[in-house]
Amino acid sequence: MQNPQNLIWIDLEMTGLNPDTDVIIEMATIVTDSNLNTLAEGPVIAIHQSDEILAGMDEWNTRQHGGSGLTQRVRESRISMAEAEAQTIAFLEQWVPKGKSPICGNSICQDRRFLYRHMKALESYFHYRNLDVSTLKELAARWAPDVRDSFKKGSTHLALDDIRESIAELQHYRKHFIKF
């Protein structure tokens, strides 16, 4: 059910860090309520890319995405960038009105840069603000390192796992760092 207070969490996996030369290979979304309770998980989409594009990945991405099985899923996928964008928007329309939720995640500006370059309709679905968990991580590192260090990440660098971890990390900071 649509609620303007719901939050849209997104994570992208890419072939590299430059939105002008690299592309999105996986995306996932989760919608939470304003108290960070998961309401729904959106489609987890491996986006087809050619062998030529995949061969252009640097060593880290080749090793990481090859080891997680993502590279093979991308090769086998028949979903285009446009189809992935349309599926994701269709999911989000069920939960959050356009322009209401900030884009939520970890180091979310990087994801937003790729969305702006490759999926403009999806990027424009979000409010212009960002809810970036990495901001709290940076503040905790400076003001309360024990709080930052008490959250252990075990990222697989798969989009859905990364979102779940970002939500858990924000819940951790809400409980141990943000006083209200």
From Swiss-Prot:
Q: Where is the active site?
A: Y128
Uppermost EC category: hydrolase
User: Any idea where the Exonuclease domain is?
Assistant: 7-170
| InterPro entries found in the cross-reference section | Exonuclease_RNaseT/DNA_pol3 (IPR013520), Oligoribonuclease (IPR022894), RNaseH-like_sf (IPR012337), RNaseH_sf (IPR036397)
Q: Which GO terms describe its cellular component?
A: cytoplasm
What's a Gene Ontology MF term here?
nucleic acid binding
Give a short account of what the protein does.
3'-to-5' exoribonuclease specific for small oligoribonucleotides.
Q: Member of which family?
A: Belongs to the oligoribonuclease family.
Protein name as annotated? Oligoribonuclease
Q: Which organism is it from?
A: Pseudomonas fluorescens (strain ATCC BAA-477 / NRRL B-23932 / Pf-5)
